[in-house]
C-alpha cells in the first residue's frame, strides 16, 4: 500500500499542486499583462489609461473580471447554444494547457517532455477550432467572417513558425525546451572567442528567423497589425460580436494566454530563456525565473509597441506576406542553416 501511494498517488498530488500553482500565477500575470497593454497604448496616445481602481489602476483587470462574472450571458435566438458556450471554453483550456511544458527556469517545469516544442505547436494549432466554433455557432455573418479569416490566418503563419522550429532543431538537436535554452550557453560569441553572453543566444546567429518568428507570432495570436479576425472597424468585433459576460472573458483570457505563450517561446528559442545576459557571478546569483520574466516582458513590450504604432494590414497584404515572403524566407533559412552546419561538421 505504501509503495502504491509513493509510486502513483503522491506524484499525482504533487503534479496537481504544481499545475494549480502555475495556473494561479499565470492568471495573475495575464491580468497585469492586459493592464500593461492598455497602459502602453494610452501612453503612446498621451493618455493616462486605467488609473482609478487601486493605486495607479493596478486592480483594474480584477475589477473587469468581477464585472464579466456577474453580468448575465446573453445567447442569440438563432445560435447553437451548446457549441456557442463550448467555443470559449475550448479556446481557454487549449491556451492554458500549453504551459505545462514551458520551463520557467532550470527544472521549473511541470512536464519536461522530449518533444515539448512539438506539443506546443500541436496544441496551439487546435485553438483555431474554438474560434471557428464560436463564429459558426453565433449564426451571424460578422462572427462567421471573422472565424474564416482567423482560420486562414493561423494556418498560413503556422507554416512559417514550423520552419523556424525546424531551424532551431537543426542547431540544437533536440525538441526539449530545456535543452534548447542550455544549448545557448555557447554560440556565435563563443566561436568568436568572446566570453559567454547574450551574443551566444540564437537571436544573433538566427536573426532572420527571429524576425520571422516575432511577426508570425503577432499573426498567430491575432495581435495588431494582424487583428483581421476581430477588426473593430470592419467586422465590429469579429468572431466575438455576439459574446458577452463570462464567455467573452474566456475568449480574452485565451487570447492573452496565447500572447504570453508566444512571448515565453520567443524568450526560450532566441533570447536564452533564464540565462543571464553575461555569464558573471553577480548576474548568475539572480534567480533564473527573474531573467525569464524580464525577457518575456521585454518581448511583450515590443508586441504592445507594434500595436500602438503599426496600422492594420489589409487581408490580401496579410496573406501575401505569409505565403510569398515568410514561407520562402523561412524555407531558404532552413536549407542555409543545414548546409552551414554540415559544412562546419556540426551536423
UniProtKB/Swiss-Prot annotation:
It is a multi-pass membrane protein. It is found in: Cell inner membrane. This is NADH-quinone oxidoreductase subunit H 1. It holds the Pfam family NADHdh. It comes from Rhizobium etli (strain ATCC 51251 / DSM 11541 / JCM 21823 / NBRC 15573 / CFN 42). Belongs to the complex I subunit 1 family. Coiled coil: none annotated. NDH-1 is composed of 14 different subunits. Subunits NuoA, H, J, K, L, M, N constitute the membrane sector of the complex. One of its GO terms (cellular component) is plasma membrane. The gene is nuoH1. Its EC number is 7.1.1.-. Keywords: Cell inner membrane, Cell membrane, Membrane, NAD, Quinone, Translocase, Transmembrane, Transmembrane helix, Ubiquinone. The chain crosses the membrane at residues 13-33, 50-70, 82-102, 115-135, 161-181, 198-218, 263-283, 286-306, 321-341. GO terms for biological process: aerobic respiration. It comes from the Bacteria. One of its GO terms (molecular function) is NADH dehydrogenase activity. NDH-1 shuttles electrons from NADH, via FMN and iron-sulfur (Fe-S) centers, to quinones in the respiratory chain. The immediate electron acceptor for the enzyme in this species is believed to be ubiquinone. Couples the redox reaction to proton translocation (for every two electrons transferred, four hydrogen ions are translocated across the cytoplasmic membrane), and thus conserves the redox energy in a proton gradient. This subunit may bind ubiquinone.
Amino acid at each position: 500500500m505504501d509503495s502504491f501511494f509513493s509510486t502513483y498517488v503522491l506524484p499525482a498530488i504533487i503534479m496537481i499542486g504544481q499545475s494549480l500553482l502555475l495556473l494561479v500565477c499565470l492568471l495573475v500575470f495575464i491580468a497585469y499583462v492586459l493592464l500593461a497593454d492598455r497602459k502602453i497604448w494610452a501612453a503612446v496616445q498621451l493618455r493616462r489609461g486605467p488609473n482609478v481602481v487601486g493605486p495607479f489602476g493596478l486592480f483594474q483587470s480584477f475589477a473587469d473580471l468581477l464585472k464579466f462574472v456577474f453580468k448575465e450571458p446573453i445567447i442569440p435566438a438563432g445560435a447553437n447554444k451548446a457549441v456557442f458556450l463550448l467555443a470559449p471554453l475550448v479556446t481557454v483550456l487549449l491556451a492554458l494547457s500549453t504551459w505545462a511544458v514551458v520551463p520557467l527556469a532550470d527544472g521549473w517545469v511541470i512536464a519536461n517532455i522530449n518533444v515539448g516544442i512539438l506539443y506546443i505547436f500541436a496544441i496551439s494549432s487546435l485553438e483555431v477550432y474554438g474560434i471557428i466554433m464560436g463564429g459558426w455557432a453565433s449564426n451571424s455573418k460578422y462572427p462567421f467572417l471573422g472565424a474564416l479569416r482567423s482560420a486562414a490566418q493561423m494556418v498560413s503563419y503556422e507554416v512559417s513558425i514550423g520552419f523556424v522550429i525546424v531551424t532551431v532543431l537543426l542547431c540544437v538537436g533536440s525538441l526539449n525546451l530545456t535543452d534548447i535554452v542550455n544549448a545557448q550557453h555557447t554560440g556565435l560569441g563563443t566561436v568568436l572567442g568572446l566570453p559567454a553572453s547574450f551574443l551566444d543566444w540564437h537571436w544573433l546567429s538566427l536573426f532572420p528567423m527571429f524576425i520571422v518568428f516575432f511577426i508570425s507570432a503577432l499573426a498567430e495570436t491575432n495581435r495588431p497589425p494582424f487583428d483581421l479576425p476581430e477588426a473593430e472597424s470592419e467586422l465590429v468585433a469579429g468572431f466575438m460580436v455576439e459574446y458577452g459576460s463570462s464567455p467573452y472573458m474566456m475568449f480574452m483570457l485565451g487570447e492573452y494566454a496565447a500572447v504570453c505563450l508566444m512571448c515565453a517561446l520567443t524568450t526560450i528559442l532566441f533570447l536564452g530563456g533564464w540565462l543571464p545576459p553575461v555569464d558573471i557571478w553577480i548576474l548568475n546569483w539572480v534567480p533564473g525565473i527573474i531573467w525569464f520574466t524580464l525577457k518575456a516582458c521585454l518581448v511583450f513590450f515590443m508586441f504592445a509597441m507594434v500595436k500602438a504604432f503599426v496600422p492594420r494590414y489589409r487581408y490580401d497584404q496579410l496573406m501575401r506576406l505569409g505565403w510569398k515572403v515568410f514561407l520562402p524566407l523561412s524555407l531558404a533559412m532552413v536549407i542555409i542553416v543545414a548546409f552551414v552546419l554540415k559544412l562546419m561538421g556540426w551536423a
